[in-house]
Structure formats: structure tokens, C-alpha cells
């Protein structure tokens, strides 16, 4: 009550912020007459002037009004577009590091030019993040004209571009790219072995377009760079043959082998199912011993493969969750309907789906580097974003990213009419109504956009429309390449476009069709008459569509998130245009079936509803919204939980990547190596000669043997211990340290300082990367089983933090030991020695080849028909020549001349 009274008196926080920013808009507008009078050269000279003022200590906020006024005037001259006042407010919100919620068609791309220009003046780089490569290249090309005119450089990054081009793009004042590309390049940079191999500068400022899609919808999917693991994929194929023989239960208590938890996207074997699965696996020879049981320790890998196969068959559907293209399983984004080429599900799920579809099963991958979008974007010094739908997720943006959402008013009032939902008993009745609505719109010349939640539904609707003779376009993952063309024509009179979810998001649907696309098709050499004719035709179509009611949106199912539904609705009614929307639902829809209250379904059946009967009731709409809120809260908990765990990994990642940066930047890592060597020697001696112990507890011979095997240092300590009466552990440690230091000094003297420094750096980076890779695998295993600790009355998150710290400490110790072992055992040769060894190897290879020829002939001599063998081979016997040795014979126990350090008999002298 009090809050509502205060809001009425003082306005909401959003209104108060808008009032403050409106004062700045007044200042910018006051500067406009002065800025308009500047010549092109004078306007362009403002950029270096602003840079000088910033260098002199002036703040960005101080020059904001003038910089925004300059950018607005430059945009008017170069692009023919002048920023509205509400767009200036949007630009200020982005500059302040907040999220600007702006309705579809309000010109978010143009809004971004204001804060991008202002922040690029600092020269530290601005990243503009888009949801796909098409939008990144389009926006970089269109807005790049403005930035270049103002004296700023623009780059765009995309997969597969040459290394030098990508470095140049990241070195630009402004860089466009997708969230995936920025993330993967960050990981690649932290796997590079030299500064020259890195792309990115410090993460300074990012503006994320469609920020809700990237920071919320994709937050559950970590970016992973991986390499193939050693395990064969054969077991996935064998287990895949078992799963179709198991039967699905209708409920957890029903009869069958397994039941599906659709909320959690998991499959669980029943008691009977475990026994049946064991029996089938034994028959297939996958389980070896019937007495051990499916859940014995040695069969855990089989359980992992079986769970993956069950999920692949029972939960993941073709043309809904993935498509099969060119013999590969390609994931379909559940939020946008776009294909995610190059991405793979983890935990063996992708391999299980490949086995199910009968395409080649690729090896499981081992993680080399990974990061979540949550932790990637939180590393930017300043982060902001823009979208048409953020207010429903304002709490999550604030709590996880520290980003406040500011709702920007529209330039013109929205006149779209949102009709109430229509609820049917089953899918058949629902789709009959959808088809009737589409046909009605097509007859009246009203364009209609139909949003579906799967490729399967879009193709089913397409088939019905084809039979009814209704011309239409389908926009889903299978028509990804034609996306821009289809969206450009979606506003034509009577056009029918079926789209999966938000495919085509980022491109406006203009009533009457895209005038820009028609101009582009004419070419630059088109006459004024031709352009005038096109403009006249477009205006006629535009007016006809407005008269028919504008763009009509049909939703065939409610999404789990209200935000996705709002995005679909937001495609209509842009810039004050007319439009309408309606959602058609059925009790068989996933949201209604899984999350809506049972009483809704019972009530509709008790009322004797038939297939084509419809309900339009606020009570039902409230229940649907309640179900959506439940799912949103559930998904938020999942993302928050993921972040809690990844924060542990992130702290460790920061330590490792900071260490790598130090190594890459250092001219020499000798001091690091010396320090590590001291630690390793101390630990090594302490294993055999514990501190503060008596000599009866010492294992001196063990220490000598370990020094020889691990460090290549021969040192006699036994005599010293026997002959010296008063000797302690510290003296032994000092003796060992001196011997190892001398061993390293000897190596350095032999090869020179420069070579040794380069080797030390290379070994430290390589061992650190290998250790981190193995540590990530251990962390994955720890994460997968950590929830079992809950059964022991322990907090899984606390246990994870504790054990992750122990694993990390262990990894760092292992890295230290491995660095010293490698540097101690490595043998570096001069160029002359390498050339000599290569010549020796050539001679040895030639001798082995001749020996094998002689052996073959000798063996042939013992055959029953030597002449027949010669006729079949087509060769006469080779003359046996005397082989003379230029060098002393290499004994089988001598070191191999190749320099491997192995005995000759275990290297190039192995018996075949």
C-alpha cells in the first residue's frame, strides 16, 4: 500500500531515471543547431578533438552531450537517419552500463552507434555482440560507414577467418561478432603459446544485442574447446541396439522398464527395467559377469552409455531438438530455431543420438578449455545490452550480472491488439482453428506470421496449407540460408510465413515488404524513375496492409518463458503500425501437460468440451501464466546453480590464465624455474629423508634411485651418510640441491642461455596446459557425482568447493614436478649433432632395409619351390653384396644413436 502510494507521488524508479536522462536530451538538442552548421571536415575533426580532451583528463560523461550530437548529425549525413529523442535516451542507458528494453522496430542498431562512438574514443576497443554472423556482418557493413566517416576503424570477426585478419579486426576501435566467436577467441587466446598467436586486447566494453537471448537463454550452455578422447565410440552403437527393446512407462508407478521426467529432461530405469536391461546387456556380451550387476564399479561406463541412449531415444526428437544434415546430427537452438553447427552435446548424448540416427558416431571429446557466457561477459570492465524483452527477467539480470533494466518509451504509441488465448481440448482442434485463421488473413490480404516451437510443427502446418492451396514460406533451421529473404517479404499483402520460435529475429518485418531490399535488387545504377516506381508500388502495398489490420501474429503454443511469447508478439505493431496477435493452445501442449494445474484439464473435460470447442477465459490465462512463472523460476534456479559451480572453476581459471599471461609476457622464466626446482627438491628429499627424523628412518638408496630415474642425476649419498657421524636431513637436502643445480647449469652451458630460456618457457606453458586439461576432466567427474553427497547429509556445493580446491592444489604440485622432470631429462643437441644424427639414422635405415631383403631371400631358400616363388614375384634373386661398417658396431645395450636416451635394443634396434 505504502509502496504504491510512494510510486504514485514520486514515480517508479524507471520513470525517475527517464526524467534525469531527458534533461541530457535537452542539452543535446540545444547543441544541434551549432553542430548542423559545421562543414563535413569540421564535423569529422571532432573525433580527434574528443580524444585529446579525454587524454587531458576529461571524462566520457562530460563530453557525452556533444559526442552524441556529433554522432546524430553524422548519421543524418552519412546514413540518412537522425536519432529520435527516445533513441538518445537508449544510447545513454547503454553508456551507463545498463540494459535498454526497446520495442521491436525502435531502431536498436542505430541506438548502439551513440555509446559505441563515445566509448570507442578511449581507444581500448568496443565489442558489439550479435546473435549470428549474418547480423554481425550486416551491422558492421551498415554502421561501419558512419564510424569510418568519423575516423574510427571497424572490424568483424567470424569463424574460419585468417589469423592476421582476425588480429586486425580485434585491433580496430569497434569489433562486431557473435557471442560464440568472442568466447571461443578468448579461450583460444588462453591456449596460445606466444603473444603473436593471440587475438584479443583487454575486455573493455561490450554492447550485447538481444541480451536476453545471449545472457539468459544461452547461459546454461558453456563454451567448450575440446579434443577427441581415446575411447572408441563402438559401445554407443552396441548399447543403441538394446534401448528399443525396453518399454516406456506412462508414469513413475506404471508398468514398464523406464519413465521419463520431462521437467528435468531425465530418464530413470525402474526396478524391473534394471533387471531387463542387465539381461539384454549380458546377451549382447556388453556385461561380462551376471553376478556383478549393472551398477558394479566396473560397469559404470555401461550405465553412462545406457543413460545417454535412453535420453537420446525418449527425450530428444528429430526435427525438434536436432536435424540430420549431410550425415551429421546438428543441434537446433530451442529458443531461436536456428541450427548450431559445430556445437555438440556433452556427456555422450551427442554420440548416443548419432548412434540412434545411424550416422557415423564421432569420438567423445575431452575438454581443453571452457567458460560460461555468465563468466565471460562479467569480465568486461563495462557491459550493457539491448532487447525488446528484458523486464520479465530484470531480477536475474540484476542478481547475476549487476545489470539494471531500463524500459525505454516507444517513439510512437503501440496500437497492436493482443487477443486473448484460445484453449482447445486437443492439438487437432487447435490446428483446425489456426488453419482457419491463416486462410481468413490470406483472403483479406493481411500478412500473417505463424510462430511454432519445432520444425516438425512448422512442416506439418506447411503440408496442410499446401493442400489447401495457400501460398506460404517456411522459415526454420532447414531454410537458414534464405532467412533474410523470407523475412524481407513477410510483410507483403496476404503473405503467410511460418517460423520456428524467433528465427529471423534481428530483422524487422516491414508492412508492404522491405523497400530497402527492392532498392538493393535494382542496383546502384538504377534511374530515379525506376526508384520512384518501386517506391510508389511499395506505398500502395503498405497502405493496403495497414488497412487490412497490419501484421497478424499467430502463436501455436505458449513457450516456457513469457519473454519468448512477448518477442513473437513484438514482431507486429512496430513504430506505431497496426497489428494483432493471438495464441492458440491445447491441453496436449507440453506446457499445459507438464506444468499447468490438473484442475484445468479436469474442468474442461467435465464441461463436456468437444474437439473444436474453445475457451477464452481469464482464469485459464492466469493458470497458463502461473505455469510459465513456475518454469521461469525453475530455469533461473538451474542457471544460478550452474553459476555457483562455475564460479569455483572460474576462480581457478583466472589463476591459470593469469599465470599463462605472466609466462607469455616474461622475457625469461629462469627465476620461476629456479624457485620451482627448490620446491620440488625439498619435497623429493622429504619423501625419503623426512625433516626432524633419525637416520634409521631414512631411505637413502631410494633417494639415490629416484634422483637417477626422475632427474637423471647420479649422486652417492650412502657413503656420505656412512662416513659422517653428525649429518642431518638439511645437509642431505643441500647436497641434493647443489647436485641438481649443477646438472641444470651443465645443460645450460652446453646449449647456451637463449636456447635454455626458450626451452624453459615452452616446457612451462606446455605442462601447465596439459595439467589444466587433465584437471578439467577431473572436475567434470567430480561435478557429475557431487549430488550423491546429499544422501550422506552433506552440502554438495560445499563439498565441491573443498574437493575442487584439493584437486587444484594437487594439479599445481604435479605441474611443478613435471616441469623439473622434463627440463632435467631433456637432451638438447646442437645443429651439427642433429645433422650428424640424421645421417647416422639414414645409414642405419639403409642397413636395416638391406638386412630385411637378405632375410627374405634366406627364408625363401628354405621353401619347397624357390623357383615358383621367384616366378610369382616376378623378381630374380638379388646378388648378395658384402656390407662393410664405417663406424663401430652399436651394442644392443648401448644408448641408441638417435638421442632418445633409450637403449638401442628398445629403440631403433628392436627385433621385428
UniProtKB/Swiss-Prot annotation:
Pfam families: P-loop_SecA, SEC-C, SecA_DEAD, SecA_PP_bind, SecA_SW. It catalyses: ATP + H2O + cellular proteinSide 1 = ADP + phosphate + cellular proteinSide 2. It comes from the Bacteria. ATP binds at residues 87, 105-109, 508. SMART domains: SecA_DEAD (SM00957), SecA_PP_bind (SM00958). May bind 1 zinc ion per subunit. GO terms for biological process: intracellular protein transmembrane transport; protein import; protein targeting; protein transport by the Sec complex. Zn(2+) binds at residues 896, 898, 907-908. InterPro entries: Helicase_ATP-bd, Helicase_C-like, P-loop_NTPase, SEC_C_motif, SecA, SecA_CS, SecA_DEAD, SecA_motor_DEAD. Residues 865-912 are annotated as: Disordered. GO terms for molecular function: ATP binding; metal ion binding; protein-exporting ATPase activity. Keywords: ATP-binding, Cell inner membrane, Cell membrane, Cytoplasm, Membrane, Metal-binding, Nucleotide-binding, Protein transport, Translocase, Translocation, Transport, Zinc. The keyword Zinc-finger does not apply. Coiled coil: none annotated. Signal peptide: none annotated. CDD domains: DEXDc_SecA, SF2_C_secA. It is found in: Cell inner membrane; Cytoplasm. HAMAP family: SecA. PANTHER family: CHLOROPLAST PROTEIN-TRANSPORTING ATPASE, SECA INNER MEMBRANE COMPONENT OF SEC PROTEIN SECRETION SYSTEM. This is Protein translocase subunit SecA.
Amino acid at each position: 500500500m505504502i509502496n504504491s502510494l510512494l510510486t504514485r507521488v514520486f514515480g517508479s524508479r524507471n520513470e525517475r531515471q527517464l526524467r534525469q536522462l531527458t534533461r541530457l536530451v535537452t542539452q543535446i538538442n540545444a547543441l544541434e543547431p551549432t553542430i548542423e552548421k559545421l562543414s563535413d571536415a569540421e564535423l569529422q575533426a571532432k573525433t580527434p578533438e574528443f580524444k585529446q580532451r579525454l587524454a587531458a583528463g576529461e571524462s566520457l560523461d562530460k563530453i557525452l552531450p556533444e559526442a552524441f550530437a556529433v554522432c546524430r548529425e553524422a548519421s543524418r549525413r552519412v546514413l540518412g537517419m537522425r536519432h529520435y529523442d527516445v533513441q538518445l535516451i537508449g544510447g545513454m542507458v547503454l553508456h551507463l552500463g545498463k540494459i535498454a528494453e526497446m520495442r521491436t522496430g525502435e531502431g536498436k542498431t542505430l541506438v548502439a552507434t551513440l555509446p559505441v562512438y563515445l566509448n570507442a574514443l578511449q581507444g581500448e576497443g568496443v565489442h558489439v555482440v550479435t546473435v549470428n554472423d549474418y547480423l554481425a556482418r550486416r551491422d558492421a557493413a551498415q554502421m561501419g560507414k558512419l564510424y569510418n566517416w568519423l575516423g574510427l576503424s571497424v572490424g568483424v570477426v567470424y569463424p574460419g577467418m585468417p589469423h592476421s585478419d582476425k588480429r586486425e579486426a580485434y585491433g580496430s576501435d569497434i569489433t562486431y561478432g557473435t557471442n560464440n566467436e568472442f568466447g571461443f577467441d578468448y579461450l583460444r587466446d588462453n591456449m596460445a603459446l606466444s603473444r603473436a598467436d593471440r587475438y584479443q586486447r583487454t575486455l573493455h566494453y561490450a554492447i550485447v544485442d538481444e541480451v536476453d537471448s545471449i545472457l539468459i537463454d544461452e547461459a546454461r550452455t558453456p563454451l567448450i574447446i575440446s579434443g577427441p578422447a581415446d575411447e572408441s565410440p563402438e559401445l554407443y552403437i552396441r548399447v543403441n541396439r538394446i534401448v528399443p527393446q525396453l518399454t516406456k512407462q506412462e508414469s513413475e508407478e506404471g508398468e514398464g522398464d523406464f519413465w521419463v521426467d520431462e521437467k528435468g529432461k531425465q530418464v530413470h530405469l525402474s526396478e524391473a527395467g534394471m533387471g531387463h536391461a542387465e539381461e539384454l546387456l549380458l546377451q549382447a556380451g556388453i556385461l561380462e559377469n551376471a553376478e556383478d550387476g549393472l551398477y558394479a564399479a566396473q560397469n559404470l561406463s555401461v550405465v553412462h552409455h545406457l543413460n545417454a541412449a535412453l535420453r537420446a531415444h525418449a527425450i530428444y526428437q528429430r526435427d525438434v531438438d536436432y536435424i540430420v544434415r549431410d550425415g551429421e546430427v546438428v543441434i537446433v537452438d530451442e529458443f531461436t530455431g536456428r541450427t548450431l553447427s559445430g556445437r555438440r552435446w556433452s556427456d555422450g548424448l551427442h554420440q548416443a543420438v548419432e548412434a540412434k540416427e545411424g550416422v557415423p558416431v564421432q569420438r567423445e571429446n575431452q575438454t581443453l578449455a571452457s567458460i560460461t557466457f555468465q563468466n565471460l561477459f562479467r569480465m568486461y570492465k563495462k557491459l550493457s545490452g539491448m532487447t525488446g524483452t528484458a523486464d520479465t527477467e530484470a531480477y536475474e539480470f540484476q542478481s547475476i550480472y549487476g545489470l539494471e533494466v531500463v524500459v525505454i518509451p516507444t517513439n510512437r504509441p503501440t496500437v497492436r491488439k493482443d487477443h486473448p488465448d484460445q484453449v482447445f481440448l486437443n492439438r487437432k482442434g487447435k490446428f483446425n482453428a489456426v488453419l482457419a485463421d491463416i486462410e481468413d488473413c490470406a483472403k483479406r490480404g493481411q500478412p500473417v506470421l505463424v510462430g511454432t516451437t519445432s520444425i516438425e510443427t512448422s512442416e506439418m502446418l506447411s503440408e496442410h496449407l499446401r493442400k489447401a492451396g495457400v501460398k506460404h514460406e517456411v522459415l526454420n533451421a532447414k531454410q537458414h540460408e534464405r532467412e533474410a529473404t523470407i523475412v524481407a517479404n513477410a510483410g507483403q499483402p496476404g503473405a503467410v510465413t511460418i517460423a520456428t520460435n524467433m528465427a529471423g529475429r534481428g530483422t524487422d518485418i516491414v508492412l508492404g515488404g522491405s523497400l530497402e531490399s527492392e532498392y538493393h535488387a535494382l542496383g546502384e545504377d538504377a534511374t530515379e524513375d525506376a526508384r520512384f516506381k518501386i517506391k510508389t508500388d511499395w506505398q500502395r502495398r503498405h497502405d493496403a496492409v495497414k488497412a487490412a489490420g497490419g501484421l497478424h501474429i499467430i502463436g501455436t503454443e505458449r513457450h516456457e518463458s513469457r519473454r519468448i511469447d512477448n518477442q513473437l508478439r513484438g514482431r507486429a505493431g512496430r513504430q506505431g503500425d497496426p497489428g494483432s496477435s493471438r495464441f492458440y493452445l491445447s491441453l496436449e501442449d507440453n506446457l499445459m501437460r507438464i506444468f499447468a494445474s490438473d484442475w484445468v484439464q479436469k474442468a474442461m473435460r467435465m464441461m463436456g468440451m468437444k474437439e473444436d470447442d474453445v475457451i477464452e477465459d481469464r482464469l485459464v490465462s492466469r493458470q497458463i501464466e502461473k505455469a510459465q512463472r513456475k518454469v521461469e523460476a525453475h530455469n533461473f534456479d538451474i542457471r544460478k546453480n550452474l553459476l555457483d559451480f562455475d564460479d569455483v572453476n572460474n576462480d581457478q581459471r583466472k589463476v591459470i590464465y593469469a599465470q599463462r599471461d605472466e609466462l607469455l609476457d616474461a622475457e625469461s622464466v629462469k627465476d620461476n624455474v629456479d624457485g620451482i626446482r627448490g620446491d620440488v627438491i625439498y619435497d623429493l628429499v622429504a619423501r625419503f629423508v623426512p625433516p626432524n627424523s633419525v637416520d634409521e628412518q631414512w631411505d637413502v638408496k631410494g633417494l639415490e634411485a629416484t634422483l637417477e630415474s626422475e632427474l637423471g642425476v647420479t649422486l652417492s649419498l650412502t657413503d656420505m651418510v656412512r662416513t659422517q657421524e653428525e649429518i642431518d636431513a638439511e645437509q642431505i637436502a643441500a647436497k641434493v640441491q647443489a647436485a641438481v643445480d649443477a646438472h641444470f647449469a651443465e645443460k645450460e652451458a652446453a646449449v647456451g642461455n637463449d636456447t635454455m630460456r626458450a626451452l624453459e618457457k615452452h616446457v612451462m606453458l606446455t605442462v601447465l596446459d596439459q595439467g589444466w586439461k587433465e584437471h578439467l576432466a577431473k572436475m567434470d567427474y567430480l561435478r557429475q557425482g557431487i549430488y550423491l553427497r546429499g544422501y550422506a547429509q552433506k552440502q554438495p556445493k560445499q563439498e565441491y568447493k573443498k574437493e575442487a580446491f584439493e584437486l587444484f592444489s594437487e594439479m599445481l604440485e604435479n605441474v611443478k614436478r613435471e616441469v623439473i622432470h622434463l627440463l632435467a631429462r631433456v637432451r638438447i643437441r646442437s645443429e651439427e649433432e642433429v645433422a650428424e644424427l640424421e645421417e647416422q639414422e639414414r645409414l642405419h635405415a639403409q642397413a636395416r632395409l638391406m638386412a630385411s631383403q637378405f632375410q627374405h631371400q634366406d627364408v625363401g631358400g628354405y621353401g619347397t619351390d624357390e623357383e615358383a616363388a621367384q616366378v610369382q614375384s616376378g623378381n630374380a634373386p638379388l646378388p648378395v653384396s658384402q656390407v662393410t661398417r664405417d663406424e663401430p658396431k652399436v651394442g644392443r645395450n648401448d644408448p641408441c644413436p638417435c638421442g632418445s636416451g633409450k637403449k638401442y635394443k628398445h629403440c631403433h634396434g628392436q627385433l621385428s
